[in-house]
Amino acid sequence: GVNGKVNYDTLSRVNTFAHVNHSADQTRLGVLLCINGVGILNSWVKRNVAPEGISYPALNELAATVPIGSEGLSILPFGNGAERMLQNKQVDCSIHGLNFNIHNKAHIARAAQEGIVFSFKYGMDIMNEMGIDIGVIRAGNANLFLSPIFRDALAGVTGTVIELYDTNGAVG
């Protein structure tokens, strides 16, 4: 997010920095939400759970066969080391509510994306505590934002509008 006033999270759960548009006359501070491990969860599911050789679009189609809520399966996506937004705790990734008689690869694919969405929501709540009102998410048309499941869940859970741009993080 970009903020027009000087503030920060006292627990350093998000990173505040001078935005490229910042000047002495106009305060423009960026606030960066770092969620360590969320993208890697989706790629881990693709490599280790989904059928071999599956593409990301096909993985999204597989996940779409499962209803919202993954029939009670949930995944906390923090499996790539300490999490800044969790005060540098290493909580690891965990799967909850797994029922061997109900859940399959499709459920895991959907639950992973839903877990990532809720980690975003948690981080956005931190930003809201700082006075940043997030009504629009502007993102590159890349990575998880290519997934309709992810986009729809993120918009629904956060109450935001998602605007996609023909760019990716490499462009800046």
Residue ranges and their predicted role:
Residues 1-172:
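Active-site core segments that coordinate phosphate-bearing ligands/cofactors
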